Amino acid sequence: MKRFFLFALWLVAFAFAEDMASAPWAKGEKLSYRLSWGFITAGSADMLTLPLGDGKIEFVSVARNNGAFNSIYPVADTIRTISVGERFLPESFKKILNEGSYHSTSKIFFDREGKKAVLSDTVFENSKRKEIKRRVDTTVTIQGYEHCIISAFYRVRSMDLTGKKDTYFSAVSGKKRYSLQVVIHGKETVETDLGKFDCIKVEPMLGDDGAFKASGRLFIWLTDDARRLPVLMTVKIPIGSIRGELVQFRQGTVN
């Protein structure tokens, strides 16, 4: 279940020329979410933006479950990516999944000059990560402006979404280069524990035919202001849906 929400957090990719360096989150940010399945609080997730200097930023996303869910099916997932330049195109991407008995590490290294992305996916026998169950290495041809799925999440927040039409982009994830469509559904008012927010509702869709085949429909509500805070996300799963609600945020220097 947590993997569906993480996929939601990471599933957007853009190559627009808006200046991300001036975005409020570029100087540091921490977003904390409560993950719910129906009326049940299933876990939490944090997304951090950490400036590294020399025009580089590290994006970190961590998700975990809690309570009874953790005793039945423990989840502890982490994603890190380092991006560089005004567009913050990713240099590297690393995803570590620990979900029940499933343990894997995925890496992507972007070679912009060589127009390729080198991907490595490793599944381990157990949580100690010493015995390899299987490993697949893949090289994907890129055009030079592709994002990984986490840096792309911040790309959409830097865009001027007012009045824009549906747009198509591409990103590298898993073992291939994907085509993505972003549908802008318009403005809505969203009420959370943090208050009421005027938002722009967007829907990323995966696949050449515009169908979100991987995990059902995903909706993201971004505040209609310069912060573009993702205050609410929902994604359909085979049984019900997962809701990610922003419960705390901080912009500026974070630890």
Predicted region positions:
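Sec-dependent N-terminal signal peptides
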Residues: F4-A13
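Acidic, serine/threonine-rich low-complexity disordered tracts
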Residues: E18-G114, R155-N255
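Hydrophobic, well-structured mid-protein blocks that either form specific transmembrane helices
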Residues: I108-Y154
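Intrinsic disorder/low-complexity signal
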Residues: A17-E18, A76, S120, V136, ...
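Low-complexity, intrinsically disordered regions enriched in charged/polar residues
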Residues: W10, Q143-I150, I184, R243
